[in-house]
C-alpha cells in the first residue's frame, strides 16, 4: 500500500528510513578497482555487515521503521513493467551489442527476483553467465571482467535520492561509478507499492535525459526546516544542479529559500554532510573549515517570474540564523587537537544522523568529538564503524529518511 512520505527537517522525529546492507558489490572491491569505484580501501564485508546490522537495530530500537534497499528492489521487480524497464536501462545495447544484450536480458529476466536484485546492485561478470550464451563480446573478455559493474556506493543511500518536504529528488550523480544507482531508485519510486501512485512531487532527476553538468547528490542537501534548504556545492553537486532543484522547490511551493554554500573541492569534503550536520534546533556539528568567513554563500529565493533571485551572504552562519529565525547558531566543532580533529573528520565525526532534537547516531571511534557532543547536551548513540568507516561515510551518509517530522 502506498504510504505518505514527508521529510520536514533534519532534526524532527525520524520515523522511516531506507538503508542498504553491505552485500555482493563490496565483495567485488579489490585494491586494483577500489579507486575507480570511489572507495579508498577494501572492506571486510562480513564485519561491515555486522556493523550495519547494529546500526539498523539501533534505529529500530528507537521506534524507527527501517526499509532495506535490496528488499525494495526485489519487490519492485515483481512488477513486470519495472523489471522490463530496469533490464533495458541497465543492460544497454550500445554497451554490449544488440545480440549479446538481448541474450543477457532474457537470461536475467528468468532469474529469481532476489538474485536479480543482487546483481543489479552487485554487478555481473562474464564468468557468471551460462556457457550457452556465445558471442564475440564474450570471446574477447576475461571471465572476471564485468558485464555490469558493481554499485558499492549504494551503501550510501543518502546520495542517490533525497526527500525534501513533500517530494523527492532522484539525483543525477556526478561520477560514472554511481550513475546507474539512480535507475534502481527511479524504478522503486515509480513502481514499488509503497510509492506507486503516491501523492508526492518528483523535483528533479526522473527523466531519460543527459543532465550534463547539472549533478546533485543528497549528501549535499540539508532540509533545515521552516521552508529552507541548505545545499553544498561540492565536488559532486554543481551550481547548475542547485539551480534546477531550487526552481523546482519554488515552483511547487515547497521551499521559500535555498542557501547554497561553496565547499572546498577535495576528498575529505566530498559532501556537505561530511563536514556539517544539523543536530538540534539551534545546533550544528561542523568541521571549522566550512564556516570560515571567506567561504562563499548565497541565498536563492523566487524572483516572481519563475526564475531565481540570488543574494550573497556575509557568512554561512548569518544565512542560517536568518533562515531559522534564531539569534545565534551554536556550532560544535570536531573534537581534539588539530591532528585529532582532522583524523576524526576523516572518520565521519561530523556525519551523524539525528533521530530527534539532540539525539544522534555516530561512530563510537570518534571519542574526542563524541565527548564534545556529550558536554553540549547532545546524546550520541554509538555504533561501530571500523569497517563501514573505510567507505568514507557515516550514519547520515548511510541513511535516506523517508518520513521525518518538521520543526
Swiss-Prot record:
EC number: 3.5.3.6
Keywords: Arginine metabolism, Cytoplasm, Hydrolase
Compartment(s) where it occurs, according to its Swiss-Prot or TrEMBL record: Cytoplasm
Name listed for the protein in its UniProt record: Arginine deiminase
Protein source organism: Salmonella paratyphi C (strain RKS4594)
Keyword Acyltransferase listed: no
Gene assigned in the entry: arcA
HAMAP family, A to Z: Arg_deiminase (MF_00242)
Superkingdom classification of source: Bacteria
Amino acid at each position: 500500500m502506498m504510504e505518505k512520505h514527508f521529510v520536514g527537517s533534519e532534526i524532527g522525529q525520524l520515523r522511516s528510513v531506507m538503508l542498504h546492507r553491505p552485500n555482493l558489490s563490496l565483495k567485488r572491491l579489490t585494491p586494483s578497482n577500489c579507486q575507480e569505484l570511489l572507495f579508498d580501501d577494501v572492506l571486510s564485508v562480513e564485519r561491515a555487515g555486522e556493523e550495519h546490522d547494529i546500526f539498523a537495530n539501533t534505529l529500530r530500537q528507537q521506534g524507527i521503521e527501517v526499509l532495506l534497499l535490496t528488499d525494495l528492489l526485489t519487490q519492485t521487480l515483481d512488477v513486470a513493467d519495472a523489471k522490463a524497464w530496469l533490464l533495458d536501462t541497465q543492460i544497454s545495447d550500445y554497451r554490449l551489442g544488440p545480440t549479446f544484450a538481448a541474450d543477457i536480458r532474457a537470461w536475467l529476466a528468468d532469474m529469481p527476483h532476489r538474485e536479480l536484485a543482487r546483481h543489479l546492485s552487485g554487478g555481473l561478470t562474464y564468468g557468471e553467465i551460462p556457457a550457452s550464451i556465445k558471442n564475440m563480446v564474450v570471446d574477447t573478455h576475461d571471465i572476471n571482467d564485468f558485464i555490469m559493474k558493481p554499485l558499492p556506493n549504494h551503501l550510501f543511500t543518502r546520495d542517490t535520492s533525497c526527500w525534501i518536504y513533500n517530494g523527492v529528488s532522484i539525483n543525477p550523480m556526478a561520477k560514472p561509478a554511481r550513475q546507474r544507482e539512480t535507475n534502481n531508485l527511479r524504478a522503486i519510486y515509480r513502481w514499488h507499492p509503497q510509492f506507486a501512485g503516491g501523492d508526492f512531487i518528483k523535483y528533479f532527476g526522473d527523466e531519460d535525459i543527459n543532465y550534463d553538468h547539472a549533478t546533485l547528490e543528497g549528501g549535499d542537501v540539508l532540509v533545515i526546516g521552516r521552508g529552507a534548504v541548505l545545499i553544498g556545492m561540492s565536488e559532486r553537486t554543481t551550481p547548475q544542479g542547485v539551480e534546477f532543484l531550487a526552481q523546482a522547490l519554488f515552483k511547487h511551493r515547497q521551499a521559500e529559500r535555498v542557501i547554497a554554500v561553496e565547499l572546498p573541492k577535495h576528498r575529505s569534503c566530498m559532501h556537505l554532510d561530511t563536514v556539517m550536520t544539523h543536530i538540534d534546533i539551534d545546533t550544528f556539528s561542523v568541521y571549522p573549515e566550512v564556516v570560515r568567513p571567506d567561504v562563499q554563500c548565497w541565498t536563492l529565493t523566487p524572483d516572481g517570474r519563475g526564475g531565481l533571485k540570488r543574494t550573497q551572504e556575509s557568512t554561512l552562519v548569518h544565512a542560517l540564523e536568518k533562515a531559522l529565525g534564531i539569534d545565534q547558531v551554536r556550532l560544535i566543532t570536531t573534537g581534539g587537537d588539530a591532528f585529532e580533529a582532522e583524523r576524526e573528520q576523516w572518520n565521519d565525526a561530523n556525519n551523524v544522523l539525528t533521530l530527534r532534537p539532540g539525539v544522534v547516531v555516530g561512530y563510537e571511534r570518534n571519542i574526542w568529538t563524541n565527548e564534545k557532543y556529550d558536554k553540549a547536551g547532545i546524546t550520541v548513540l554509538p555504533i561501530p564503524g571500523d569497517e563501514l568507516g573505510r567507505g568514507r561515510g557515516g550514519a547520515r551518509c548511510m541513511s535516506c529518511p523517508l518520513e521525518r517530522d518538521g520543526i
